[in-house]
UniProtKB/Swiss-Prot annotation:
PANTHER family reported for this sequence: PHENYLALANINE--TRNA LIGASE, MITOCHONDRIAL, PHENYLALANYL-TRNA SYNTHETASE
GO CC term (a single one): cytoplasm
Alphabetically ordered keywords of this record: Aminoacyl-tRNA synthetase, ATP-binding, Cytoplasm, Ligase, Magnesium, Metal-binding, Nucleotide-binding, Protein biosynthesis
Pfam annotation, one family: Phe_tRNA-synt_N
Family in the record: Belongs to the class-II aminoacyl-tRNA synthetase family. Phe-tRNA synthetase alpha subunit type 1 subfamily.
Protein name from the UniProt record: Phenylalanine--tRNA ligase alpha subunit
Cofactor(s) essential for the protein: Mg(2+)
Amino acid sequence: MHTLIERLEKVTNSKELEEARLNALGKKGVFADKFNQLKNLNGEEKNAFAKEIHHYKQAFEKAFEWKKKAILELELEERLKKEKIDVSLFNAIKTSSSHPLNYTKNKIIEFFTPLGYKLEIGSLVEDDFHNFSALNLPPYHPARDMQDTFYFKDHKLLRTHTSPVQIHTMQEQTPPIKMICLGETFRRDYDLTHTPMFHQIEGLVVDQKGNIRFTHLKGVIEDFLHYFFGGVQLRWRSSFFPFTEPSAEVDISCVFCKQEGCRVCSHTGWLEVLGCGMVNNAVFEAIGYENVSGFAFGMGIERLAMLTCQINDLRSFFETDLRVLESF
């Protein structure tokens, strides 16, 4: 039985400690076997042997408790060493990058401001006149059906486009005017390509009649799109907007399939990016301008960002999913 304590002294972990305990104190252990041998003894020999077994059993249990305490302390120390956090260890600080929408906004502004365009910021809450009527969209005009608008009391509403900023600018300033405006706009729509809040940027140039022609508009738009998208092909299409006449929409060759045809471009090889045109005389009359001409253009910032970042779901810009945002 001396070997039991000697084996116990060589134990180095909890697993070995449990094995030593079962070997000595288990139902089939050494001490259980010794107690079973007592039935074969008689008288003083039995008493002496029983006393000896109890002595060694108590000695083993005492040694076991001491060893158990030592093993637990040792294992705790080793575990704390592994889990220890070295606060002095250098940890590289992650630097943030621009949100795709902010990057797109800044890139657009960087193109137009050196050309003399002044950045104008307008109110998000507008009235019916500045948002609709002054833009050749009088009450009951069928084009208003396209606008799912958030209305307030007293004919107030959340602007559905940034065009009201152009109206305010023309009311407050006199030609020549070169301006861009950008910001949030609101419409009641929510799906893969629409959100209730989205961003637009528009531009306006106004000068004395005859000084601004469609060729000027065409040159500005083509320079901008080549700056923004690189070597893409452009396609001009006639269109209709109540506030411009003539009006056009501009497409670029698909940046995803290189005009081979894909789901994004509906297998046409072209992607619509903006609308533009010469300012309708009805808009100038609503402001009180005479003998002037000008052009205007507008585009969705999310649309441009989706094309440059190759994102299919517009809602990804607003859901703060870092797995998505950190991929840009």
